[in-house]
Amino acid sequence: MITLDWEKANGLITTVVQDATTKQVLMVAYMNQESLAKTMATGETWFWSRSRKTLWHKGATSGNIQTVKTIAVDCDADTLLVTVDPAGPACHTGHISCFYRHYPEGKDLT
């Protein structure tokens, strides 16, 4: 059994969400033990909102639910990779992914 490291980030686990089909990274959010348990129980993503200090069911308002396919744990047991089938855009701006901007803006580093 894998033991997750909840202590490193004060009870939170960084969670990378990836489209199970396209492999595109959709978003990064945080889970606490309760949101991970709800994710496991419902098969849909739940997160902890650091700003609102409350649980957050992704897509509950927008309808853009994320159905969980797999959950992987990194080598340090402090980050999760959750693959999902998204029902719509992941970003609150309406973009498919929250990673639609480049830094520095408009420039490639190569």
Curated annotation (Swiss-Prot):
Domain of life: Bacteria
Chief localisation class: cytoplasm
Binding-site positions, Zn(2+): C75, C91, C98
EC number: 3.5.4.19
SUPFAM superfamilies associated with the record: HisI-like
Top class in the EC scheme: hydrolase
GO molecular function list: magnesium ion binding; phosphoribosyl-AMP cyclohydrolase activity; zinc ion binding
Subcellular localization: Cytoplasm
Reaction(s) this enzyme catalyzes, per UniProt: 1-(5-phospho-beta-D-ribosyl)-5'-AMP + H2O = 1-(5-phospho-beta-D-ribosyl)-5-[(5-phospho-beta-D-ribosylamino)methylideneamino]imidazole-4-carboxamide
Any Gene Ontology CC annotation: cytoplasm
Annotated positions binding Mg(2+): D74, D76, D78
Keywords attached to this entry: Amino-acid biosynthesis, Cytoplasm, Histidine biosynthesis, Hydrolase, Magnesium, Metal-binding, Zinc
InterPro entries according to UniProt: PRA-CH, PRib_AMP_CycHydrolase_dom, PRib_AMP_CycHydrolase_sf
GO terms under biological process: L-histidine biosynthetic process
Matching Pfam families: PRA-CH
Role according to the record: Catalyzes the hydrolysis of the adenine ring of phosphoribosyl-AMP.
Family to which the UniProt record says this protein belongs: Belongs to the PRA-CH family.
Oligomeric form and interacting partners: Homodimer.
Record protein name field: Phosphoribosyl-AMP cyclohydrolase
